[in-house]
């Protein structure tokens, strides 16, 4: 039995600001739906927390420390049956600079 391989675009988004990430996901899904492609997502992935421990004093006091953290929020969007219109619309889409985008065909 031969099965047809479905064409798929996987878009992976990362950002430090969750609200900025969600608005970017909405723009991508709306663009895909306008060009008659099927968009599944955004699928939230686990948030990565990176904690930095810094001494508060420039001197010897090792008891006084301060913690800082960065949170990286991630989402995945799958677009099935993309046409050339879909790819052109996604290329022309204006997204904020705080969002890291990775596209796989």
Curated annotation (Swiss-Prot):
Keywords: Ribonucleoprotein, Ribosomal protein. Involved in the binding of tRNA to the ribosomes. Pfam families: Ribosomal_S10 (PF00338). One of its GO terms (biological process) is translation. The gene is rpsJ. GO terms for cellular component: ribonucleoprotein complex; ribosome. InterPro entries: Ribosomal_uS10 (IPR001848), Ribosomal_uS10_CS (IPR018268), Ribosomal_uS10_dom (IPR027486), Ribosomal_uS10_dom_sf (IPR036838). GO terms for molecular function: structural constituent of ribosome; tRNA binding. The keyword Ribosomal protein applies. NCBIfam families: PRK00596.1, rpsJ_bact. It comes from Nostoc sp. (strain PCC 7120 / SAG 25.82 / UTEX 2576). Part of the 30S ribosomal subunit. This is Small ribosomal subunit protein uS10. Belongs to the universal ribosomal protein uS10 family.
């Amino acid at each position: 039995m031969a099965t047809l391989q479905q064409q798929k675009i996987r878009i992976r988004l990362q950002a430090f600001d969750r609200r900025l990430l969600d608005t970017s996901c909405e723009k991508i899904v709306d663009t895909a739906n306008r060009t008659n492609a099927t968009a599944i997502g955004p699928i939230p992935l686990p948030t990565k927390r990176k904690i930095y421990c810094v001494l508060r004093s420039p001197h010897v006091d090792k008891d006084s420390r301060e913690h800082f953290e960065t949170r990286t929020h991630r989402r995945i969007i799958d677009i099935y049956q993309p046409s050339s219109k879909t790819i052109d619309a996604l290329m022309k889409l204006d997204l904020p600079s705080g969002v890291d985008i990775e596209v796989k065909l």
